[in-house]
Amino acid sequence: MNHITVFGSSRCKAGESEYEFAEEVGELIGKYGHNVATGGYQGTMEAVSKGALNQGVTVSGVTVPSLFSEKSEKGFERRPNIYVNNEIKAESLSNRIHFLLQDSKAIIVLPGKIGTLTELFVAWNSNYLFNINENKDLIPIFLKKDYWKKIVDEFPNNMELNKEFLNYFEDIAQLEMFVSKLN
């Protein structure tokens, strides 16, 4: 199933601006009839799922039950959010990221922590390898650039990479124009 993948924090709550923005992203994706895939838990994953489900599309949540029990040590709920209508259980974080990237038409990276950073880097590296091997179309990656700018801008300098490495990203401000044209 083709979908648009959204990565983001599990920590924001309903009523916070980050949550509301993520819900709007989900609504926008669903408005144009695209299915959505997230990590399936709370925070921005829940907000995106809620917005997309309200538009009647399939909302896949790729969970990792072996790592995330019903409650974590800190008391955060770790069940799929109630807006997921297609749970995919992955065996590991690596498998989870693989499922989320597989068949993805586009990737949206919202603010997050180390898990979101890992997902961003795997998606970024996948596009880099696709570009080198010229055997697959690049997956458009949309960032909330005001949040990710420092990492994205400095990383190629620190790793002595070609500045072309930065061309893999689009600003989330261009999202509606892009999503409206996807098949």
Residue spans of the language-model regions?
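A charged, well-structured terminal subsegment
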Residues: 99, 161-183
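Short Gly/Thr/Asp-enriched flexible loops that form oxyanion-binding sites at enzyme active sites
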Residues: 47-52, 118-131
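Short glycine-rich, flexible loops that bind phosphorylated cofactors or substrates
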Residues: 13, 115-117, 132
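A donor-sugar binding/catalytic signature common to diverse glycosyltransferases
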Residues: 101-125
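Short, acidic/small-residue loops that bind anionic groups at enzyme active sites
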Residues: 61-65, 110, 124-151, 161-166
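Acidic/glycine-enriched connector segments
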Residues: 43-110
